[in-house]
Amino acid sequence: MISKENKKKLIELKEYVALATINSKYANANIELIKYMTEEVKSPGVYVTLNKPFRTIESDLKNSKIDTRVIIFIDAVTKTAGGEIKKIDQCLFIGSPENLSDISIAMDQAISSLKEKDKFLFFDSLNTLLL
């Protein structure tokens, strides 16, 4: 559960936000932020996964009782890891995290497909993009 103090800070933030978290709290912080955006703010969004395959992220979110139907995923891991890729309406698979052009195109398509005014774009890791 996101703390009252952190919730207040999130509410006060501007339209564009970059948050950083320490490694030991990374997984929990990601889930708390997605839960906050989908349940309290009630915004749909795009989740760009650069560290874990879509199926793993989807399972983690569902285990935390997060409705993944309001999230479009961009998976830049599964192909690189040799995982099985099946066409899924809510997930766009990208060749690798290093393919920034494909990630950018996929983000544009995903964000454009969300008709709501308020939406979020979430990267599970920016460090991976620096490789």
For each feature predicted by the language model, list its residue ranges.
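Glycine-rich P-loop/Walker A and Walker A-like loops and their local beta1-loop-alpha1 context
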Residues: 1-60
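Nucleotide-state-sensitive switch-loop elements of NTP-binding domains
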Residues: 5, 64-94
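Short coil/turn segments at beta-strand junctions that form active-site/ligand-binding loops
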Residues: 43, 69, 117-119
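A structural signal for isolated positions on well-ordered beta-strands in alpha/beta enzyme cores
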Residues: 46, 72, 120-122
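Short beta-strand/turn micro-motifs composed of small residues
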Residues: 49-51, 75, 123
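Short amphipathic alpha-helices and their capping/turn segments at secondary-structure boundaries
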Residues: 57-69, 107-115
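Phosphate-binding/switch loop-helix module in NTP-utilizing enzymes
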Residues: 81-131
